[in-house]
């Protein structure tokens, strides 16, 4: 596997005392026997974290569909909040 991607973005302003970040990853898994590329998108805040990742059964296109659904729902929620 030659391609690798890892990027973390802080979500709060620099002067904020709160923590929050999102991380996107594509690369080799550290799990034994996991031969396919490992992909995840993780969102974290002060006390919690959630990771959407591919399973051994997911193909790359299935994972991409999940990510697009997540993005679309987040966009809808932002539009709603802007109008409240």
Model-predicted segments: where are they?
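Positively charged, low-complexity terminal tracts
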Residues: 1-84
């Amino acid at each position: 596997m030659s391609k690798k991607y890892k990027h973390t973005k802080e979500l709060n302003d620099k002067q904020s005392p709160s923590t929050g970040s999102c991380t996107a990853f594509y690369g080799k898994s550290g799990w034994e026997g996991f031969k396919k590329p490992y992909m995840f998108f993780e969102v974290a805040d002060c006390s919690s974290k959630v990771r959407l990742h591919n399973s051994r059964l997911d193909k790359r296109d299935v994972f991409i569909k999940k990510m697009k659904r997540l993005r679309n729902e987040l966009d809808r929620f932002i539009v709603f909040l802007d109008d409240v």
